[in-house]
Amino acid sequence: MSITNNMESPSDSEVRLTLNDRALWTKFCSLTNEMIVTKSGRRMFPVLKLTASGLEPNSMYSFLLDFAPADSNRWKYVNGEWVPGGKPEPHAASCVYVHPDSPNFGSHWMKQPVSFNKVKLTNKGNGGGQQIMLNSLHKYEPRIHVVKVGGEAASERTIATFSFPESQFIAVTAYQNEEVTSLKIKHNPFAKAFLDAKERPDQTDFHSLAGIPVSSPQVPSWYGRNGSTSSARHFTHCNSYGGESELTSVQDTAIPSYTSRNCMRNSYRGNARATPYTIPHKELTCQATSFPEPVPNDGFYPMFPNSELLPRTTLNNYSPAMGAYTNSSIVTSSDIQSGNNNNFFYSNNNNINTTDEVPTTYMTNDFNSFYNQSSNSGMPGTTYLPYQSSPVNQFYSYQPPYSTEIADISPTQQDIINAQNPYQTAWTPPLSYDGCSTMYNSITPYSSSGESTTSEMTLLATARYLQNLRL
């Protein structure tokens, strides 16, 4: 450490600055340290931190930083080492960086290390503010000036200037020495994204998963500015706090990547996914509902309700579930069941015993809708009447007072025509499959002679009896 004192009082001779992280700076110095300079400015690593002592606690001080040329050479990197490469460029007057805490009391500077972590190095002029312009491929040495503010003359004066030889570096636009690159990646917290994929346990080799060989490089090696080559690939890196940290690189030559002199906000190409992410989803399933299904025009029914994708079967095997028809609405009758064991009906019960349950005739108060509705069940001999959304609705199975031979009579198209014109000769009301006469209101059939026949009166009485049961 070199000190230049401009002492005017005995207390000024006691001012001392100690370089923090001296061991780390020494490692970089042994490898010839490199610092990145860019147009927009790049922060230093290692960060220049110092511990102050010997300041007057109640006096005001300012801390300033500038960079002085360490020699009169221009440098180049050849065959893995830095060698002088010609005369230097004219050195412009170096800008001075003023610490943002300046001016402040001596007690403030001594209670914690003085850190110059916000200074940026640039290779373009007129940076101003936090930027200091340096010439690329030139060696520099940082200098810290301690300025005392105030006093009797109310002026500023520099009381001491400190420099540290182990902090010397060569300004570069891209790292040349791989060992310097590795050391910065290892110690710089903002360069962890550029660690070798083999050294990071949380990395996944997506190239091997996709069957892509990683041994063959996909980009040419980097060529230096002076014609020298380097197998390292060079990157710049932006930290997540808005500022920019050290330029870092990747050692693993097996993973291809691009070279860049600009700030890369993404990690190297080897970390890219070879295959896109999969989107988890639920498999859509077809669910049956409890609503009746319209009758297909081709005379066949699907095996399950509301599913046109499944195979169809004939009417004899069709038994879908319908919420409107429950077991509570079925009245068993062993006498009627003797002629109807082969019939099927709608039910919500999966375990149907056809030996005890019988099909049902469904009743309505609307006579016209009775004849205008087509059979939704599609079964021969069964007439479907629209379901009335009323709490009074109940469905019954009724055993008629006449023989089962009449119960086997099915309504025909002529029966329906006759029912629509009840005053014609030899009118016979249509019958359901189980022998129950179809319900109607305010219809009194007469024969051509004007008197009701015995058969017609029997059917009329049966119809009225079933209406009373419904009410």
Swiss-Prot record:
Localisation: Nucleus
Tree of life domain: Eukaryota
Cited Pfam families: T-box
Keyword DNA-binding among record annotations: yes
This protein's record includes keyword DNA-binding: yes
DNA-binding positions: 24-196
Cross-referenced SMART domains: TBOX (SM00425)
Stored CDD domains: T-box_TBXT_TBX19-like
One Gene Ontology molecular-function label: RNA polymerase II cis-regulatory region sequence-specific DNA binding
GO CC annotation, single: nucleus
Keywords assigned by UniProt, alphabetized: Activator, Developmental protein, DNA-binding, Nucleus, Transcription, Transcription regulation
Tissue: Developing notochord.
GO biological-process terms attached to the record: cell fate specification; positive regulation of DNA-templated transcription
SUPFAM superfamilies: p53-like transcription factors
Disulfide bond entries: none
Protein's job: Involved in the transcriptional regulation of genes required for mesoderm differentiation.
Protein name (Swiss-Prot/TrEMBL): T-box transcription factor T
